[in-house]
């Protein structure tokens, strides 16, 4: 098993953990924050949960495609960008929602837009790599 296959398995596991974590975030927003009357914080946590589920599934699909050698010639930068972006974006929103007056929340709040930029960059790179793979395959035919 080569290094790329190991990293692909790592990203599948990370994606699955993000989906599981997102389910818990959604439950916390619905049952804890809404019960306390903190609707805005609950909405932020819901956004973090939704992004976590979608991006976690995306990580799993991208890593599985790489594992099946669809993108074997390319480094796994889309997964790295998506994983880091998800951590900054959803993690920052979750911290701001669950502990709004804490130092951690103050430190992570500026990371939220950076995470969004990394998420977008990751998907742009997916598009570029896919076009490159299709171009190379069509060139060989």
Label every PLM stretch briefly:
Residues 17-27, 43-68, 80-91:
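Core segments of alpha-helical transmembrane spans in multipass integral membrane proteins
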Residues 76-96, 108-127:
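Hydrophobic alpha-helical segments of small multi-pass membrane proteins
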Residues 30-44, 93-114:
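Interfacial helix-loop-helix junctions of multi-pass membrane proteins
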Residues 52-62, 117-129:
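Hydrophobic cores of alpha-helical transmembrane segments in multi-pass inner/ER membrane proteins
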